[in-house]
A protein has these predicted regions:
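Binding/recognition "hotspot" determinant
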Residues: 1-59
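Alpha-helical transmembrane segments and their helix-start/interface "positive-inside/aromatic belt" motifs
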Residues: 1-11, 81-101, 204-215, 270
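Hydrophobic alpha-helical transmembrane segments
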Residues: 54-66, 158, 163, 181
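Membrane-helix interfacial "entry" motifs
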Residues: 5, 39-50, 75-87, 148, ...
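Alpha-helical transmembrane segments
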Residues: 192-209, 273-279
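Non-cytosolic segments of integral membrane proteins
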Residues: 94-187, 225-278
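Loop-to-transmembrane-helix entry motif
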Residues: 48-55, 91-95, 172, 182, ...
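Hydrophobic transmembrane alpha-helix segments characteristic of membrane transport
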Residues: 59-95, 187-201
Length: 281
């Protein structure tokens, strides 16, 4: 409900947008790809994965032949039992990876999701702490006359614009994680087929590392939200109420946006953080 003051209502509207996106992230991060958007997207991805398995089997043979040609100097070497057995085992394991790739990837995601749930439970947070305007700041704004409130309009518009942009960047980053999961799952049979040949196996290793990093991004996002929640529980203080109203509001909004930038930056760089910490780059 509006307070009757345009400046206060504008700031509250921006903070409601921010709080709404935080609540959505908290819900999304605990959602599995099968449950996302009712599971309709996941069903399409499963069908694409199944269709690409046929191509994966064809590439399996191609990568296997290429691997044999490059690793074996001659046909005589291929006749050696240990070499033939090694190539056979590699082909069987690669075929199993293509056939059971969906189960392998969903299992890896469940492990990462279990870590996310553990972090959520350990933090003691059932929901994100809402960011609200302090009553002291509202009183300062409401006591300002019409002429003196003109600078406040510019400060409020600029601050609200920053908050809206940060909210959109933050939620788009979390949604992009789901899209990366879907894309990786859909094309999985292609890179997994590369395990059939030793020279091409680096493609499959890079793919699995990238998928593991995507799954573990959720841990960084949750940790960033938990840390920001601690910041939000102690909002920026009004240091000196004798300053001009525009200065007080600017100082408050500036510190608030800085805290928001820390959260958005951590979420935006979650993939890079995981790759550096876990060596998955």
């Amino acid at each position: 409900m509006g307070s009757g003051n345009w400046i206060v209502d504008n700031l509250n509207s921006a903070l409601e947008m921010w709080n709404g996106r935080l609540a959505e992230i908290w819900q999304l991060i605990s959602t599995t790809p099968e449950e996302f958007k009712g599971g309709g997207v996941w069903n399409v991805i499963v069908n694409i994965n199944g269709a690409l398995q046929a191509i994966g089997y064809a590439l399996l043979v191609l990568f296997f032949v290429m691997g044999v040609v490059k690793t074996c100097g001659s046909f005589t070497e291929m006749k050696k039992p240990e070499v033939a057995f090694k190539c056979f085992i590699r082909f069987v394991l690669a075929q199993a990876a293509v056939s059971w790739g969906m189960e392998l990837m969903t299992g890896a995601f469940r492990v990462a999701q279990g870590m996310v749930t553990t972090i959520m439970d350990s933090s003691g947070l059932t929901a994100m702490s809402a960011t609200t305007l302090p009553d002291e700041l509202v009183s300062v704004i409401e006591d300002v006359g019409f002429i003196d409130s003109i600078p406040l309009w510019a400060v409020t518009l600029l601050g609200s614009l920053f908050i809206w942009v940060l909210s959109l960047v933050m939620i788009l980053t979390v949604y992009s994680r789901f899209f990366k999961l879907y894309i990786a799952t859909a094309i999985a049979p292609i890179p997994l087929a590369s395990f059939a040949g030793q020279p091409s196996s680096s493609i499959g290793v890079a793919f699995l590392k990238s998928y593991a990093a995507i799954c573990l991004e959720g841990c960084v996002i949750v940790l960033a939200c938990v840390i920001f929640s601690a910041f939000a529980s102690s909002p920026p203080a009004i240091a000196d109420d004798t300053l001009a109203a525009a200065t007080i509001v600017w100082n408050y909004v500036g510190e608030l946006i800085f805290n928001m930038l820390v959260l958005v930056g951590a979420i935006k760089m979650s993939d890079r953080i995981i790759r550096e910490l876990m060596g998955l780059g």
